[in-house]
Structure formats: C-alpha cells, structure tokens
Swiss-Prot record:
Cys-rich CT repeats lie at residues 57-81, 82-105, 116-139, 140-162, 163-186. It comes from Dictyostelium discoideum. InterPro entries: ECM-enzyme_regulator, S_mold_repeat. This is Cyclic nucleotide phosphodiesterase inhibitor. Residues 1-20 form the signal peptide. It holds the Pfam family Dicty_CTDC. One of its GO terms (cellular component) is extracellular region. It comes from the Eukaryota.
Length: 237
C-alpha cells in the first residue's frame, strides 16, 4: 500500500512540473505585442497571441494594417465564373453554388464559328469556344462516311470481291457480304482439300474428270452466310 501511495505522489509531482513549468514574469510576453497582435501568458502554454482583427464569419476576410492597427473587412467572392450556377455564401459554411436554368450558348459573349463545316462549334459554361469533330454517320453500313467542304458526305461502297463464285451484296446493318454461288474453277486438284479456299460459307469438291474445283453455297437453313459463318436472322439489303 505504501508503494502505491509513493507512486501517486511521484506522478502528481511530475504532472505539476510538466504543466506548471512556464514563468510568465520571466517570459514577459506582453513585450511582443504589436498593433495587430496582443500576447498573453499562462503557466500551462506560455506565451500565446490573439489577433486584433478576426473574421466574423466564413463570408468575410479580415486584415490588419501593421502600421496603424486598423482592421479592414472584405466580403469573400463566391463567383465560380459559371453562368449556369447561382453563387451564395453562408456565414457558417462558406461559398456554395446552385445550378440554374440557362443555355451556355446563349450566354456566351463571343462568336465561336470557325467556318469549318466539319466541326461542331459551341461555347461552354466558362465562356470558352470549343470545336468538336462533326460526327458523320448515316447509320448505313453500305456507305462511306466522310466530311468535306460541304459537310458530311455519304458515298455508296462497292462490295465486288472479284470472285466469280460469289454473289456480292450489302446489308445496311452488316455491310458487305458475299454469298457463294454454284460455279467451277479450273485449277489442278487431286482431292477435295485441294479446293479449300478457307471460306466457311461454301462447300467444294474436286472433279477429277475435268480437273476443276466445283463450289456450292453452304446450307445455312435459309439464313445468309456472312463472315464465314451462318447467321441466325434475315438480312435487309
């Protein structure tokens, strides 16, 4: 029990030493006073200062003139330079913005037309001109979409593959496709595999009597064959 009491006495002594260590008379904190700051002292923290000019809330800034000690209070600007927001200040929270109903293109103060028919010109919410590439797409896989001096151009593409054993078509959805038709090509062949052209849409045989490869359309159950495989739906040309 005696050991516990002695330990408590030592602990209290250390506490008193740690938190009562500053001698305010010796520190003479008031000698550090300026026209904008007043210094004080406690035995716990020593010297500390208080600013003469302080902001009353989060919507104002306070500044002190070091020469005169006069305080100047200014209002904080909450303008985010976005014409499509209304900007406010709450004394306890500071700046905040609320979206409004506006058309940045109407608010824009400058002409953003770059006279390029292949760009879409607009003014953003920060009053800055932007030019994005014109998206020329008619949704038709059978046309080549380009942009020129007159704007968007849509040119029909050729699906001719120069293969006498295919009929060439174009689907607005898939683009070009080539359906095998019955035909014969005079090429040397000894077995059927000699006629293999790696076309998944055709079948073939080797006619040994004529040394020709005979080709036929693959049976897809009435569905078209596109990109070397049977489709599961109809094709609109």
């Amino acid at each position: 029990m005696a050991k516990i009491i002695i330990s408590l006495i030592l602990l209290l002594s250390l506490f008193s030493f740690s938190y009562g260590a500053y001698n305010c008379n010796k520190l003479n904190c008031s000698s550090k006073n300026t026209k904008c700051r007043t210094f004080s002292c406690t035995s716990v923290v020593g010297c500390y200062y208080t600013d003469k000019c302080t902001s009353p809330d989060l919507c104002h800034n306070s500044a002190c003139n070091a020469s005169t000690g006069n305080c100047t209070l200014t209002t904080i600007s909450c303008n985010d330079n976005n014409p499509c927001t209304d900007d406010f200040c709450h004394p306890g929270y500071g700046c905040y913005s609320v979206p409004n109903s506006c058309d940045p293109g109407v608010i824009c103060q400058q002409n953003c037309n770059d006279n390029d028919p292949c760009t879409y010109d607009f003014c953003d919410a920060l009053n800055i001109c932007r030019h994005s590439e014109t998206y020329c797409n008619d949704g038709d896989a059978c046309t080549l979409n380009t942009c020129g001096v007159n704007g968007c151009n849509f040119t029909k593409i050729s699906c001719d593959d120069n293969d006498p054993c295919t009929a060439d078509y174009c689907s607005t959805l898939y683009g070009c496709y080539h359906e095998p038709i019955e035909c014969s090509i005079k090429v040397p062949c000894n077995i059927d595999s000699d006629c293999n052209r790696n076309n998944g849409c055709e079948t073939f045989t080797c006619n040994l009597s004529t040394n020709t490869c005979d080709y036929y359309a693959k049976n897809c159950g009435g569905w078209p064959c596109i990109n070397n495989q049977c489709t599961t739906g109809s094709i609109s040309n």
